[in-house]
């Protein structure tokens, strides 16, 4: 009987950030730009984007790379940002005082971000592979 789970050959390289104080759609705007990129490219993109969501996402990518290095002995240059999910978290509800004793409701959304990285040699992308050279990255077709 076949398993219904993940079909990847090795264990997952995961990093999870929970209850990040930003809305999920603002985090997805940034996440969609780095999905499928290499570790170095993802960090360069995040450094140049002018959004506040870039900082916690870059911290999470650093954490995933540190997990891969510490737990599996993989090199950071060989990592690829694979599956990335942004889910909505709890909503903090607050009240802003208004005139004449009224209260104005404020909702402060949170989100959960999950990054699953994979090694470039194990990636399932048949079109492109990336090789590390002395002068950065060289794209080649398989």
From Swiss-Prot:
GO MF annotation terms: rRNA binding; structural constituent of ribosome
A matching Pfam family: Ribosomal_L22
GO terms under cellular component: chloroplast; large ribosomal subunit
Tree of life domain: Eukaryota
Disulfide topology: none
Location of this chain's protein in the cell: Plastid, Chloroplast
SUPFAM superfamilies from the UniProt entry: Ribosomal protein L22
InterPro entries: Ribosomal_uL22, Ribosomal_uL22_bac/chlpt-type, Ribosomal_uL22_bac/org-type, Ribosomal_uL22_sf
Keywords carried by this UniProt record: Chloroplast, Plastid, Ribonucleoprotein, Ribosomal protein, RNA-binding, rRNA-binding
A biological-process GO annotation: translation
Main localization (coarse): plastid
Family membership noted in the UniProt record: Belongs to the universal ribosomal protein uL22 family.
Function (record text): This protein binds specifically to 23S rRNA.
Assembly and interaction partners: Part of the 50S ribosomal subunit.
The protein's name in its UniProt record: Large ribosomal subunit protein uL22c
Species classification: Eukaryota, Viridiplantae, Streptophyta, Embryophyta, Tracheophyta
């Amino acid at each position: 009987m076949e398993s219904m789970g993940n079909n990847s050959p090795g264990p997952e390289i995961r990093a999870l950030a929970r209850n990040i104080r930003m809305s999920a759609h603002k985090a997805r705007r940034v996440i969609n730009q780095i999905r499928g990129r290499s570790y170095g490219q993802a960090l360069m993109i995040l450094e140049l984007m002018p959004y506040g969501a870039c900082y916690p996402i870059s911290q999470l990518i650093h954490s995933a790379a540190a997990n891969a290095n510490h737990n599996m002995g993989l090199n950071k240059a060989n990592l690829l940002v694979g599956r990335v999910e942004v889910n909505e978290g709890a909503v903090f509800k607050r009240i802003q005082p208004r005139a004449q004793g009224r209260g104005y409701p404020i909702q402060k959304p949170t989100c959960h971000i999950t990054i699953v990285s994979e090694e470039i040699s194990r990636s399932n992308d048949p079109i492109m592979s990336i090789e590390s050279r002395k002068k950065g990255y060289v794209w080649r077709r398989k």
